[in-house]
């Protein structure tokens, strides 16, 4: 008999609005997650701690753990804390790093996890992946998606604008990842999940053409929804493929070679722009370029603190970060001098005088 349906993992509850976090204790009770608030709250430093100060009275039975770093060691410490009491769930309050630690520990403890996001820097708020550092470098670990996602716009507005804008770069990089997935399908026979593509593309397109910005509640709602949809795309696919291609190989390479130069979302947008340049997809290159410029995101290696030679080395090293993945980088398989020529041309196009010529040509 043919299989006519399939089960899709998704959050049980999503709330994106001002004042959303005030309903956390109520959510735990209403959704039968924890009738008396016996949860372990993993807090990010800064905003996470500030939010907890407003919630502590409503959750007197909760335990508290401050996340010091997005590391496997820190996640293991949180896991040990979970063994000390019979907790009903893990609540992560903070940015992507805090949520990654909370997701990992909750998954290993077989407990539900509630994500309370204080910024929108990348799609980690709802993804089935935790990115954690370890003594050998960094790794991506498969985890359960959050049972519930809360995004309080009051706190997102207080987050550093640069961090919030970077989520735009992560969302639009889906477009490049999708192209890489189809490329792998054509040349390697890799299966493509159409529903995952639909979620990932919808997330990216929602950001690509908007003319408002992060000062607007409507824009932040759209960005939060885009990042949640990206997480859904990965859950549906059972892999990060719909949201991770050459763009993310470049991110991992830059992080390995120059770990302090920029953040995930900014590098995702830059990596996607370079990938569209390599594909010689001028219409899509122009759209992505305009979106990044509109939101003040990096479009040139120098914008993230890299010179041409450093960016070249990162691009050449990028395929080694995901040996199992086939993207435009593996497809072209350019040698050093050929790639140097492409990097130089890309730099000329995206430096200020080059941008003026591009913008004049596309009016």
Where are the regions a protein language model picked out?
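ATP/NTP phosphate-donor binding region
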Residues: 1-89
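C-terminal charged capping/lid subdomain of soluble metabolic enzymes
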Residues: 1-3, 7-8, 169-171, 281-363
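Solvent-exposed alpha-helices and their adjacent loops that cap or buttress functional pockets
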Residues: 6-7, 33-34, 82-85, 106, ...
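A glycine/threonine-rich phosphate-anchoring loop and its flanking beta-alpha core
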Residues: 12, 26, 108-203
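Short glycine/serine/threonine-rich phosphate/pyrophosphate-binding segments
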Residues: 24, 48-51, 97-103, 122-125, ...
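Non-transmembrane, aqueous-exposed alpha-helical and coiled segments at domain scale
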Residues: 74-86, 246-247, 282, 349, ...
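A short, small-residue-rich loop immediately preceding and capping a beta-strand
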Residues: 82-105, 109-120
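Active-site segments that bind and position negatively charged phosphate/pyrophosphate groups
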Residues: 194-302, 306
């Amino acid at each position: 008999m043919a299989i006519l349906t399939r089960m899709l993992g998704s959050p049980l509850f999503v709330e994106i609005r001002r004042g959303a976090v005030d309903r956390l204790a109520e959510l735990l009770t209403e959704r039968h997650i924890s009738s008396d608030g016996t949860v372990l709250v993993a807090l990010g430093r800064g905003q996470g701690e500030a939010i907890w100060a407003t919630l502590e009275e409503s959750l007197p039975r909760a335990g508290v753990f401050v996340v010091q770093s997005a590391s496997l060691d820190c996640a293991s410490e949180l896991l040990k804390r979970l063994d000390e009491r019979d907790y009903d769930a893990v609540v992560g309050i903070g940015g992507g790093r805090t949520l990654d630690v909370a997701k990992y520990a909750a998954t290993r403890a077989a407990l539900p996890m509630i994500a309370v996001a204080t910024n929108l820097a990348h799609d980690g708020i709802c993804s089935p992946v935790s990115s954690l550092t370890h003594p050998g470098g960094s790794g991506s670990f498969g985890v359960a998606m959050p049972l519930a996602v809360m995004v309080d716009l009051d706190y997102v507005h207080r987050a550093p604008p640069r961090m919030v804008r970077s989520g735009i770069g992560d969302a639009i990089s889906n477009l490049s990842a999708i192209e890489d997935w189809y490329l792998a399908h054509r040349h390697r026979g890799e299966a493509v999940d159409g529903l995952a593509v639909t979620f990932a593309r919808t997330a990216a397109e929602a950001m690509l053409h908007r003319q408002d910005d992060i000062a607007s509640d409507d824009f932040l709602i759209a960005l939060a929804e885009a990042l949640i949809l990206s997480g859904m795309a990965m859950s549906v696919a059972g892999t990060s493929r719909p949201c991770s291609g050459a763009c993310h190989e470049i991110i991992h390479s830059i992080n390995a070679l120059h770990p302090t130069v920029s953040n995930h979302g900014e590098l995702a947008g830059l990596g996607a722009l370079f990938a569209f340049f390599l594909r010689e997809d001028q219409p899509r290159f122009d759209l992505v370029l305009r979106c990044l410029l509109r939101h003040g995101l990096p479009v040139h290696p120098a914008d993230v603190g890299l010179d041409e030679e450093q960016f070249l080395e990162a691009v050449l090293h990028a395929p080694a970060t995901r040996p199992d993945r086939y993207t435009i980088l593996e497809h072209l398989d350019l040698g050093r001098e050929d790639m140097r020529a492409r990097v130089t041309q890309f730099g000329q196009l995206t430096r200020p005088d080059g941008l003026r010529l591009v913008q004049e040509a596309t009016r």
